[in-house]
């Protein structure tokens, strides 16, 4: 009798893993591409609470990687030159966001990490783990 709850929990876990990985199967077959103005706004809006004087910020945009899904979640790394909520981080701040892509377009963004100063290397390392490089932003 005790095996049934464990089996049910294991089966539920396996099924949830299958459904969450389905989005990764609709991967784009095209090359990397530049973000549209609307996509840039989506990402910039998600960074608003992490920077001061956003109207003065200068965004450096990296291309969207070729392996980004047509529908699903992807990671994106780039950088912003702005004042931070934490003054030691003022200046160039690499960031990592998770974006939701629908029909090949970024429709939402959530900040995973942003840091400037000597801690910028932490974000660069996080990006590198996912095959991304915020230093490719222009």
What does each model-identified segment do?
Residues 19-138:
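Cystatin/cathelin-like cysteine-protease inhibitor module
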Residues 1-18:
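Sec-dependent bacterial lipoprotein signal peptides
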């Amino acid at each position: 009798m005790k095996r049934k709850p464990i089996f049910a929990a294991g089966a539920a876990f396996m099924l949830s893993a299958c459904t969450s990985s389905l989005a990764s199967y609709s991967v784009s077959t095209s090359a990397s591409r530049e973000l549209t103005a609307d996509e840039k706004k989506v990402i910039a809006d998600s960074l608003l609470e992490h920077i001061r004087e956003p109207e003065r910020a200068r965004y450096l945009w990296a291309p969207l990687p070729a392996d980004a899904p047509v529908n699903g979640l992807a990671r994106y790394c780039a950088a912003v030159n702005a004042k931070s909520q934490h003054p030691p981080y003022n200046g160039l701040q690499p960031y990592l966001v998770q974006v939701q892509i629908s029909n090949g377009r970024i429709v939402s963004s959530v900040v995973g990490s942003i840091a400037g100063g000597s801690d910028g290397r932490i974000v660069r390392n996080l990006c590198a783990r996912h095959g991304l490089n915020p230093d490719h932003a222009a």
